């Protein structure tokens, strides 16, 4: 079976070896754990953002950039594709691990989750778990992890701490904006999984989302990066699953009762409590499904340029 950690390790090794060329910085801790800073104390950029996102996807996704526009305003877009959507998105990219050790906090994603089984139910549903002697984790945090944090990750992954590798970037950073927009496909796969659909029937997935401008405040940055997919994420899924027609009206974000405002405003109204937000909002704006068994195509949802530009501070 494919090892998402083995594939991601290849990308990490290249990033570590040529860190300066990625506007990143490589660190080896006293216990042997290795870290590449992609934005905490470094500039990062598109090249680092691509590597970070592809690491998150366990080496089973491809990332490209292009210039597009939203209502005539030039905007960078990220394009993501994968032929292993269930494993790459749910088994690796999903931010399913809250890493908290002492005063350190980070949202953990990436292939290390498939060793630690975070959360276990996800891996039971998709029928996957990894078996490799190194763990590669992506941490969304304003701070680099110390040795104690890396020891904790190693213990959870059942590997030696010297075999733990982490890439780190804050939400409010160029790489932060890139890698969250790079979750546009994952958002669609995650939504279908939450609806009870068997995502292993999805053969391939491709999607795009605008890369929002970096905000100074982490909470506002989180709002913009979520809005990139909620209001302007466009996804195409190829699958063999005639039953998908029963899920169509629940997939896009515009079916959520919270839809229509920038995410920051919704979050503020909810007193910055995620548990008060309608989770169905976390969906792509527009989805096309090519169902191969019956040879049909479905199209649901629509992009919302107005809210997207308002969120980005361009309207």
UniProtKB/Swiss-Prot annotation:
It comes from Methanosphaerula palustris (strain ATCC BAA-1556 / DSM 19958 / E1-9c). It catalyses: 5,10-methenyl-5,6,7,8-tetrahydromethanopterin + H2O = N(5)-formyl-5,6,7,8-tetrahydromethanopterin + H(+). Coiled coil: none annotated. One of its GO terms (molecular function) is methenyltetrahydromethanopterin cyclohydrolase activity. This is Methenyltetrahydromethanopterin cyclohydrolase. Its main location: cytoplasm. It is an enzyme of class 3 (hydrolase). Its EC number is 3.5.4.27. Keywords: Cytoplasm, Hydrolase, Methanogenesis, One-carbon metabolism. NCBIfam families: one_C_mch. The gene is mch. Transmembrane segments: none annotated. Catalyzes the reversible interconversion of 5-formyl-H(4)MPT to methenyl-H(4)MPT(+). Pathway: One-carbon metabolism; methanogenesis from CO(2); 5,10-methenyl-5,6,7,8-tetrahydromethanopterin from CO(2): step 3/3. GO terms for biological process: methanogenesis, from carbon dioxide; one-carbon metabolic process. Pfam families: MCH. It is found in: Cytoplasm. Belongs to the MCH family. One of its GO terms (cellular component) is cytoplasm.
